[in-house]
Amino acid sequence: MHYKNIKLYSYTFFLCLLIFGCGQDKSIEKNYQNHYDIESGGRLINAMTGEPSNLIAMIAGDSASSAIANNIFNSLLKYDESLNYSPDIAESWSISNNQKTITFKIREGLFWADGEKLTSKDVMFTWKLVTDPNTRTPYASDYQLVKKATTPDPYTFTVTYEESYAPALDTWTSLHILPEHLLKNEDVNSTYFSRKPVGSNYYKLKNWKSGQQVSLTRNTLSINGKANIDNLISRIIPDTSSQFLELTADNIDLMSINPIQFQ
């Protein structure tokens, strides 16, 4: 009888602990408005399911190519965090009263990663390249609507459309400007440049190991200033389950997930 009482008291004691413990448990509130100091240096490793076909976005039809090329090249304009137009290579732009002409003012003092100056000549060259019938690109149609393009000086690029075109500015956010001095005598469809690009953005190509990874390193001549991360590495891991195992093992820092994995 004494033994049964001890068991009963024990069960009652632990039940009380459980009840009061749960009652005092308070959910931790997270403040997502907190701001933290930005750290500089190090590397970021992400996983990609496919290998880039090349690093010239206008002739690439895959997302892997564009994702990496976006870190190497700039466009005339870009979107800010509120999806408003923001300066990139162009510091300003104006639209004529008849809505047919756009004048872009190019920022002065810009350089390619190899030290050559970036000017309106490069913008004109890129427009001619994307509209060239010999360039195998699916993106030409938007730029073929331009009936006239001029470069009055090294820092001005003007385009005139046959008719007013509402998405005109949008199209100039996605066209990567390419260096004329490296591509003017090249066939863009087969050039070495597609695997050894020279751009103007935060990063430049360090090495490309086919089937394994593409490594970028900080471009000290970036037109947008110093990147916070020294190196970006994109590892090619076709299977998402393998990517997840690499993520849990801390061998990669980022991966894309599907809705099932999110749940």
Cite the ranges covered by each PLM segment.
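Surface-exposed binding/hinge segments that line
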Residues: 141-183
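Bacterial N-terminal signal peptides
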Residues: 10-19
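N-terminal lobe/hinge region of extracytoplasmic solute-binding protein
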Residues: 47-97, 128, 198-199
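Aromatic- and charge-enriched surface segment that lines or borders ligand/interaction sites
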Residues: 91-136, 158, 243-248
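Ligand-site clamp/hinge motif
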Residues: 220-263
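Short, well-ordered beta-strand elements
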Residues: 40-50, 91, 101-104, 123-126, ...
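Bacterial signal peptide processing site
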Residues: 22-26
